[in-house]
């Protein structure tokens, strides 16, 4: 193995080493601090290595893994926001094994974003899923165990569908690497449909979304952030790679993505309208955002890769900020609990409101530019029905986001926020800064995305 290949695999190695050390420390230490430091070090080193590799020519690694801009962006993204999730996972008081599982989720996401082969695709997805099952259950409350059990059962079904789909594709094409997936027979079409169903579950697309609101409500907020940010981004990048490298049957693949995306936008936004619990509202909201991303993926418009990566970059700090603020208010704060929060905790109130503003896609916050990318892709592809659904979804989203956006600044009462840690404060400031930076200077993120995509 050459030095270039070792350098290309070094971020994955950092994540794996951090996870293993955290696992070894968990049973022999009295607190989770040592394991948390080990996992955080692995995540930080992986993110730093990917930043240092910016502009370095890709190294040929083999059929299983691809060292290109998509993989590098996805690895840095997973490491950075995995580290963010680890910061406020402590709020829930979860087990000492949790930091190792966070690093494993990031490792699975990094593997998935660079997957060029069915084996790597399966490995990445299952590493994410199995780690999330344990993380969802760790508080050992009724809601957490229910969320974990639902995710376990449905994840098993999705994995079965995915494996059967890959087997049928292999029977038709005789290949497991993505470039070899070329065919037009019925087995290929059925295999593609099953593969899409398996990916749709991991992506929280309707009708495979049922686990998402329960996970956001019952699981630790850090675990919800991993499922809603890191896992979602990895699956989106894997679909981008399938779009570009595999020749999946059309219009089955794009029409399936478009249909699932449209259904997710409508289901997620409509069900979020009636929610009074902040985490559950965010759970339905993330289903809608999965739908928006699926619409971009299905459009096939010029600049699809740029639009998806930009949307993911905007979406991550917004959802992370809202989930962190929610965790600091208690296990499942309601709308009424937010009343008057700005007088007690101005940082939490501001970060929560700005995060919701970005998720709604309103001006000033970065989400506004992300919505412009969405509408541009749908107009360029002349997907007028999808455009109408996206606009209706955005209007519905504005209504329920604005309810939670205004609550901290009006009224009295509410709950007494839990004591906060300095790292929580730093995370909120970091996410707030990213949201405002990408809102006022979106070229910063656009430049980073285009630099990543230039590495082929």
UniProtKB/Swiss-Prot annotation:
Membrane topology: Multi-pass membrane protein
The UniProt record lists the keyword Membrane: yes
EC number: 7.1.1.-
Ranges that cross the membrane: 6-26, 45-65, 75-95, 97-117, 118-138, 151-171, 181-201, 220-240, 252-272, 281-301, 308-328, 355-375, 382-402, 426-446
Highest rank taxon of the organism: Bacteria
Location in or out of the cell: Cell inner membrane
Any single GO CC term annotated in Swiss-Prot or TrEMBL for this entry: plasma membrane
Keywords: Cell inner membrane, Cell membrane, Membrane, NAD, Quinone, Translocase, Transmembrane, Transmembrane helix, Transport, Ubiquinone
Example of a GO biological process term: ATP synthesis coupled electron transport
Function (record text): NDH-1 shuttles electrons from NADH, via FMN and iron-sulfur (Fe-S) centers, to quinones in the respiratory chain. The immediate electron acceptor for the enzyme in this species is believed to be ubiquinone. Couples the redox reaction to proton translocation (for every two electrons transferred, four hydrogen ions are translocated across the cytoplasmic membrane), and thus conserves the redox energy in a proton gradient.
Family to which this protein belongs: Belongs to the complex I subunit 2 family.
Name listed for the protein in its UniProt record: NADH-quinone oxidoreductase subunit N
Species, as recorded: Rhodopseudomonas palustris (strain BisA53)
Source organism phylogeny: Bacteria, Pseudomonadati, Pseudomonadota, Alphaproteobacteria, Hyphomicrobiales
């Amino acid at each position: 193995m050459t030095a270039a290949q070792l350098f290309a695999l070094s971020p994955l190695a950092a994540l794996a080493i951090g996870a293993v050390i955290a696992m070894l420390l968990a049973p022999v230490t009295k607190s989770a601090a040592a394991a948390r430091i080990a996992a955080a070090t692995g995540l930080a080193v992986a993110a730093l290595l990917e930043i240092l590799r910016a502009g370095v020519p890709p190294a040929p690694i083999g059929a299983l893994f691809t060292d290109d801009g998509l993989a590098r962006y996805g690895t840095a993204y997973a490491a950075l926001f995995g580290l963010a999730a680890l910061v406020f996972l402590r709020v829930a008081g979860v087990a000492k094994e949790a930091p190792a599982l966070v690093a494993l989720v990031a490792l699975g996401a990094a593997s998935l974003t660079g997957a060029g082969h069915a084996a790597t695709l399966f490995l990445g997805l299952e590493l994410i899923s199995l780690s999330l099952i344990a993380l969802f259950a760790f508080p050992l409350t009724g809601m957490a165990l229910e969320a974990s059990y639902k995710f376990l059962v449905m994840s098993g079904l999705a994995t079965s569908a995915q494996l059967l789909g890959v087997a049928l594709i292999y029977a038709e094409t005789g290949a497991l690497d993505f470039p070899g997936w070329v065919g037009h027979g019925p087995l290929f079409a059925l295999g593609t449909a099953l593969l899409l169903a398996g990916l749709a579950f991991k992506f929280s697309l309707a009708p495979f979304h049922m686990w998402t609101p329960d996970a956001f409500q019952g699981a630790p907020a850090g675990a919800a952030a991993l499922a809603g940010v890191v896992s979602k981004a990895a699956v989106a990048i894997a679909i981008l790679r399938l779009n570009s490298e595999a020749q999946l049957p059309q219009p089955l693949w794009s029409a399936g993505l478009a249909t699932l995306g449209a259904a997710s936008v409508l289901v997620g936004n409509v069900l979020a309208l009636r929610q009074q619990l902040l985490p559950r509202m965010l759970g339905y909201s993330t289903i809608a955002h999965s739908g928006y991303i699926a619409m971009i993926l299905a459009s096939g418009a010029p600049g699809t890769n740029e639009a998806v990566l930009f949307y993911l970059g905007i979406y991550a700090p917004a959802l992370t900020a809202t989930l962190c603020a929610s965790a600091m208010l208690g296990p499942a704060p309601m709308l009424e609990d937010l009343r008057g929060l700005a007088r007690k905790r101005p940082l939490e109130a501001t970060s929560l409101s700005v995060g919701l503003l970005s998720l709604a896609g309103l001006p000033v916050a970065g989400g506004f530019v992300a919505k412009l990318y969405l509408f541009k892709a749908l107009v360029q592809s002349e997907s007028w029905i999808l455009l109408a659904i996206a606009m209706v979804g955005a209007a519905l989203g504005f209504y329920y986001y604005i309810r939670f956006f205004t609550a901290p600044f009006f009224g009295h009462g509410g709950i007494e926020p839990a004591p906060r840690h300095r790292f929580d404060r730093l995370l909120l400031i970091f996410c707030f800064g990213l949201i405002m930076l990408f809102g006022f200077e979106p070229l910063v993120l656009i430049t980073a995305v285009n630099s990543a995509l230039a590495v082929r």
